[in-house]
Every structure is written in structure tokens, then in C-alpha cells.
Amino acid sequence: MAYKVDNAIIMAAGTASRFAPLSFEKPKALIEVRGEVLIERQIKQLFAAGINEIVIIVGYKKEQFDYLIDKYGVKLVENKDYLTRNNNASIYYAKQYLKNTYVCSSDNYFVKNPFEKYVDESYYSAVYAEGHTEEWCIGQDAEGYINAVTIGGNDSWYMVGHTFWSKEFSSKF
């Protein structure tokens, strides 16, 4: 069964400490790559796929995102706990918007548009890392479903990019 995507939530609350010193003046989502602001490129790609309801979770330097409301008609939601909590807090603040939803990282640059209006099932994007990594690693059962998440691991798949959550999956939050 294919799910019609209802909306997208873009996570943009973090301080981007790994982007320092670039992130001292602006959030990483607002950094330009190849002449385009990262988050604006992602918004345009979502629009091109027919996804017009976009919620952006902000925190660090949140006022710098205000222009996106008028320019693109997005909704901003504040993660008041961005300094002490991770993306789980951002999802908590956005829980009322979870439906058939893309959950995206604001700092991804996609050359080719990865978004589609219809998606077959909930998924996470992952990359395999040989050796040790400090990323969020996933474990899988025999059918390929995620059954564990750990911070750090060896010879592991780790989460990257965007995810899709069906309404059924989202309701568990």
C-alpha cells in the first residue's frame, strides 16, 4: 500500500557545534552550499514533490528562520530544550504534526530530489561504516526492520538524511 505524504518536518534546532566557526553567526540550515541556502533547497525539493505543508523545528538563533514564513509559507515550531536535548525533543514539540510525514535534517544537500508524493512504507536512510563510528547506529532483525538504536558502534549501519513515518508509525509517539 502506498501512503500519500501529508507533510514534512525539518529539524533545524541544534547549535551545529561541528560547523563552528560557520555556525557562530547563523544556524547550519542557513549556510549556503553551491549558491543555495541548505534549508531553502530542501523546501523547494519538497514543493517540487507536491509536499506543501512544511514545519520547521527551530531553537538556536530561531529568529533567523522567520523570513521563511513569508517566503515559503512554512510553520515554525520552537524546541525550547534544544540546548540540552537532541532531536527526540524536536519530535516531541512537533508531535501534533506527525501524519504520513517526512522527517528531515536541515543540513542535508541533495543533488537529486529524494522526495516523492507517495511512499510505500516507513523507512530510515542509512549508510554502512566500516570500523568505529560515533553516529546513531541501527540494528536490524532478520526481515530488515530496525530493532535497536545505539550511539556509536563498530561495522554498523548509521542513520543519515531523511526518513518517512507513516501515520500508523507516527501514532506510536
Q: Where on the chain are the PLM-derived regions?
A:
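Canonical Radical SAM [4Fe-4S] cluster-binding loop centered on the CxxxCxxC motif
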Residues: 21
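The conserved acidic donor/metal-binding loop of glycosyltransferases
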Residues: 106-109
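A generic secondary-structure signal marking the coil-to-beta-strand transition
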Residues: 6-7, 29, 100, 136, ...
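Terminal amphipathic alpha-helical/low-complexity segments used for targeting or macromolecular assembly
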Residues: 1-6, 15, 44, 123, ...
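Short alpha-helical oligomerization interface
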Residues: 24-28
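Conserved N-terminal catalytic core of the sugar/cofactor nucleotidyltransferase
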Residues: 1-10, 18, 32, 36-103
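Conserved core of the sugar-phosphate nucleotidyltransferase
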Residues: 111-173
